[in-house]
A protein has these predicted regions:
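N-terminal alpha-helical interaction blocks
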Residues: 1-56, 134, 139-223
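Short metal-binding segments enriched for Cys and/or His
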Residues: 91-113
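Short cysteine/histidine-rich zinc-coordinating motifs and their immediately flanking basic loops
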Residues: 74-82, 106-111, 143
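Cys/His-rich metal-chelating microdomains
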Residues: 66-69, 100
C-alpha cells in the first residue's frame, strides 16, 4: 500500500530516513522489504505481501520496511482484532522506518477508506518472461475469517515493544481464526501504544475499539 505522487503524503513530501536511503523506490516511494514485486524490484504490487519474504522477515526478526535486523525497540502496526487474538501477522519495524511508513502508506495515513474491492486485478502479468508473476494467484479466503475486500478500513495503532518481548509464534488457529505465523501479543506490556488512524466504518452501531479502551486505561493508571 502506498500513496500516489499527487497525494498530500506523496514521495516529494515524505522525508526518507537515512536507514532507507539505499532502499528500492518506485515513483519516489520506498518499496517495503516484504512487498510483492515483479522481477524488477521497482515494479511492486502495492498492498500485497510476498508470503515467503514475510515469513523469513518474521522469523529472522528483520524490519518489514528496510529488511535489516531489528534493534532494541520495535514498532508493530496492529488493529483491535489483532490484539484480541494476541497475534500481529505483519513483521515489526524500526521506529524511523515505521514513521516513514505511517506517512507514506495511505491506509495507515487515513487516506484510504476501503480495502480493494477486487485484489485479483493487481496480479497482472508483466512482459518479462523470467518474472514469476505468471505463477501468482489470489490467496483463497479462509471461511473462518471475514473477507476484507471492499470493506471499510479499520482503526490502526502502533505498539512499541522491546526486542526481548518480540516473539514469533506459529498459531494453529481456531474455529474463528485461520492458522498464521506472527508476533505474539499475549501478555505483552507495550512501551507505548497510540492510535494512528480512525476506522472508516459508519459511526452508527459502531462498537467501542478495545485498543481505545486500553489506551484510556494506560493513561488513567499511568502504565
Amino acid at each position: 500500500m502506498t500513496s500516489t505522487p499527487s497525494s498530500p503524503t506523496g514521495p516529494d513530501r515524505v522525508p526518507v530516513p537515512a536507514r532507507l536511503a539505499e532502499a528500492t523506490r518506485a515513483r519516489g516511494l520506498v518499496v517495503p522489504h516484504i512487498t510483492l514485486t515483479h522481477r524488477d524490484p521497482t515494479r511492486p504490487v502495492w498492498g500485497m505481501l510476498d508470503p515467503q519474504r514475510a515469513w523469513n522477515t518474521l522469523w529472522g526478526k528483520l524490519c518489514q520496511i528496510c529488511g535489516q535486523r531489528l534493534d532494541d525497540r520495535v514498532i508493530v502496526f496492529i488493529r483491535s482484532i489483532d490484539y484480541l487474538r494476541g497475534l500481529a501477522v505483519e513483521p515489526g519495524a524500526h521506529p524511523e522506518c515505521a514513521h516513514y511508513s505511517r506517512r507514506a502508506c495511505p491506509m495507515l495515513a487515513g487516506q484510504q477508506h476501503h480495502y480493494h474491492a477486487n485484489p485479483a486485478v493487481r496480479f497482472a502479468h508483466c512482459e518479462d518472461p523470467d518474472c514469476e508473476c505468471r505463477y501468482w494467484r489470489p490467496r483463497e479466503p479462509d471461511p473462518r475469517e471475514p473477507s476484507r475486500e471492499g470493506r471499510p478500513a479499520e482503526a490502526w495503532y502502533e505498539a512499541w515493544l522491546p526486542i526481548t518481548d518480540y516473539r514469533i509464534i506459529d498459531d494453529p488457529g481456531s474455529e474463528h481464526a485461520a492458522p498464521a505465523v506472527g508476533v505474539d501479543l499475549t501478555g505483552v506490556r507495550f512501551l507505548k501504544l497510540r492510535k494512528i488512524r480512525d476506522t472508516a466504518a459508519p459511526s452508527t452501531n459502531r462498537s467501542p475499539e478495545p485498543l481505545d479502551m486500553l489506551i484510556a486505561s494506560r493513561e488513567l493508571f499511568g502504565y
